[in-house]
C-alpha cells in the first residue's frame, strides 16, 4: 500500500520537486533523442567547417557526442524510460492509483514528449550543444548497460552511413537554394546555373559541345595569304584558324592569327610557310572533363573531333566467298558500363599518343618548361609527309576551350565580333 503524504508537509514538497524533475528530465531525454539523432554527421561536419561562427561552435561541441550514434541512442532511451517508470511511484504517494496513472500519462505526453520534441526539432543544434557535457556524463553512467546493447546494434544494423547526395539530388538541392525558387535561398541565377553545369559536365562528351565540320572556317595549306584571304580571316574574328590538307576534313594543324600580323598581304606568302601548330585529334566520345584537363595543360586550346567508323570485317557467305561488312564503331546504341570505361581509356590514350607533344607538364610551372619544348608542337614541313586521318576515322567537328566553358556556364560566350554579326 502506498504511503500518503499530507499537503504542505516536507515530504510532500520533496515528492513534488522529484516529480517535476522527472518530468523535465524525461522531456529533455525525449527532445534530445529527436534533436541529436536527426542531425547527420555530414550536416554537422559542414556546419563545423563552413557554418556561421555560432553554428561552428555548436557543431564542434556536438560532433564528439553523436559520433557513436547507437551508444547515444541507447543512453537517451534508457534515461527516458527510467524517468517515466519512476514517475508513477512518486505520484502514488500523493494521489490514488488511478489518479497517478492518469496524471503521469498526461504529464509525460504533454511535457515529456510533445513540447520537448517540438522545441528540440527546431532548436536541436543549440540545445544539444548546451547540454553536451551533461550528455557525456549520462553516457558514462549508463555505459555498463548501454555499451553492450550499442555493440549489438552495430553488429546487427551496422554503422549509420553518411547521407551523401547523388548528382541529380545535389542539382535539385542547389536549385532549391536559388533565390528564384522562392524558398529563401541566397544563390543567384548565375551561381545555380554554373553549379548545375559543372554537375552535368561529367555526363557530356565531346560530340555534345563540338562545332560541326560543316560550320568551321578552315584554310588550305597551299593557299596564299593574299589580301582577300587576310581580310576573310580578320572578318571571321577567330584567334585560331584550322589548316587542312587536300580535303577540308583532313585538318592537320592550326594557325594563330596573331602570328599573321607581320605578314605583308602583297607578298602572297603560302600558308605552309608560316608557323603551323599541331592540332590534337580526339574521339567524339571523350568526356568533356577529360578534354578540359588536357586543355588546361596549355598544349592546345583546339582539337579535331573524329569518329571511329567504317571498319571492314570479312564475313563468309554461303558459297564460301568472303564479303565485306562495314561496322560503325560509334553507333548510337547505349554502351554498357564496361564499354564506356574502355572507350574513355582509349580516348585518353589517343590524346596522349599525339605525336611530338611536350611532356613537361606533369607538375610545376608551365611557363619556362613550355618555352623549352615550344617547337615540339609546331608542324615540320621540311620534306616530312603531312599527317592524314586513318581509314577508320572521320573528322566530324572542332572543339575548343571556349566550347567546353560554354557547356560549363550553360550560356553562349560572345565576343566583339559575335555581337557585330548579331547587330547587323
From Swiss-Prot:
GO cellular component: plasma membrane
Principal cellular location given in the protein's record: membrane
Sites carrying sugar chains: 273, 319
Extracellular side: 1-11, 92-94, 158-424
Keyword Transmembrane assigned: yes
Short name of any one Pfam family annotated for the protein: CNNM
Cytoplasmic side: 33-70, 116-136
Record key words, sorted: CBS domain, Glycoprotein, Membrane, Phosphoprotein, Repeat, Transmembrane, Transmembrane helix
Locations listed in the record: Membrane
InterPro entries on file: ACDP, CBS_dom, CBS_dom_sf, CNNM, Ion_transp-like_CBS
Domain CNNM transmembrane as annotated: residue spans: 8-191
Keyword Hydrolase: no
GO terms, biological process: magnesium ion homeostasis
Domain CBS positions: 210-271, 275-331, 355-416
Alphabetized SUPFAM superfamilies for the sequence: CBS-domain pair
TM segment ranges: 12-32, 71-91, 95-115, 137-157
Region annotated Disordered, chain positions: 321-340, 355-374
Residue numbers of Phosphoserine PTMs: 331
The protein, known as: DUF21 domain-containing protein At4g33700
Species this chain originates from: Arabidopsis thaliana
Amino acid at each position: 500500500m502506498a504511503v500518503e503524504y499530507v499537503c504542505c508537509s516536507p515530504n510532500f514538497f520533496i515528492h513534488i520537486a522529484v516529480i517535476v524533475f522527472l518530468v523535465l528530465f524525461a522531456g529533455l531525454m525525449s527532445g534530445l533523442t529527436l534533436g541529436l539523432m536527426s542531425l547527420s554527421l555530414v550536416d554537422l561536419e559542414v556546419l563545423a567547417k563552413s557554418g556561421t561562427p555560432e553554428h561552428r561552435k555548436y557543431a564542434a561541441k556536438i560532433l564528439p557526442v553523436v559520433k557513436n550514434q547507437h551508444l547515444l541512442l541507447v543512453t537517451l532511451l534508457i534515461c527516458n524510460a527510467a524517468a517515466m517508470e519512476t514517475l508513477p511511484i512518486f505520484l502514488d504517494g500523493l494521489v490514488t492509483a488511478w489518479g497517478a496513472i492518469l496524471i503521469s500519462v498526461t504529464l509525460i505526453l504533454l511535457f515529456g514528449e510533445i513540447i520537448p520534441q517540438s522545441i528540440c526539432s527546431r532548436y536541436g543544434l543549440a540545445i544539444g550543444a548546451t547540454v553536451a557535457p551533461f550528455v557525456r556524463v549520462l553516457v558514462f553512467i549508463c555505459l555498463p548497460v548501454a555499451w553492450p546493447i550499442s555493440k549489438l546494434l552495430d553488429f546487427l544494423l551496422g554503422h549509420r552511413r553518411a547521407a551523401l547526395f547523388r548528382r541529380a539530388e545535389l542539382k535539385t538541392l542547389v536549385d532549391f537554394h536559388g533565390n528564384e525558387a522562392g524558398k529563401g535561398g541566397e544563390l543567384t541565377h548565375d551561381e545555380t546555373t554554373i553549379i548545375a553545369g559543372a554537375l552535368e559536365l561529367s555526363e557530356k562528351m565531346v560530340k555534345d559541345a563540338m562545332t560541326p565540320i560543316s560550320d568551321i572556317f578552315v584554310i588550305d595549306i597551299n593557299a596564299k595569304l593574299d589580301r582577300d584571304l587576310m581580310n576573310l580571316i580578320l572578318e571571321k574574328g577567330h584567334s585560331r584558324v584550322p589548316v587542312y590538307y587536300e580535303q577540308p576534313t583532313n585538318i592537320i594543324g592550326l594557325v594563330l592569327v596573331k602570328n599573321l600580323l607581320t605578314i605583308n598581304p602583297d607578298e602572297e606568302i603560302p600558308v605552309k610557310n608560316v608557323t603551323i601548330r599541331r592540332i590534337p585529334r580526339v574521339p567524339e566520345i571523350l568526356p568533356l572533363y577529360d578534354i578540359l584537363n588536357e586543355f588546361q595543360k596549355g598544349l592546345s586550346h583546339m582539337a579535331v573531333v573524329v569518329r571511329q567508323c567504317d571498319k571492314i570485317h570479312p564475313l563468309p557467305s554461303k558459297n564460301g566467298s568472303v564479303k565485306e561488312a562495314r561496322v560503325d564503331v560509334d553507333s548510337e546504341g547505349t554502351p554498357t558500363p564496361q564499354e564506356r570505361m574502355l572507350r574513355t581509356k582509349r580516348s585518353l590514350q589517343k590524346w596522349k599518343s599525339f605525336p611530338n607533344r611536350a611532356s613537361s607538364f606533369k607538375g610545376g610551372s608551365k611557363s619556362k618548361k613550355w618555352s623549352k619544348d615550344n617547337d615540339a608542337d609546331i608542324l615540320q614541313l621540311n620534306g616530312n609527309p603531312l599527317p592524314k586521318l586513318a581509314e577508320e576515322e572521320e573528322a566530324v567537328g572542332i572543339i575548343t576551350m571556349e566550347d567546353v566553358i560554354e557547356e560549363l556556364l550553360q550560356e553562349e560566350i560572345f565576343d566583339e565580333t559575335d555581337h557585330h554579326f548579331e547587330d547587323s
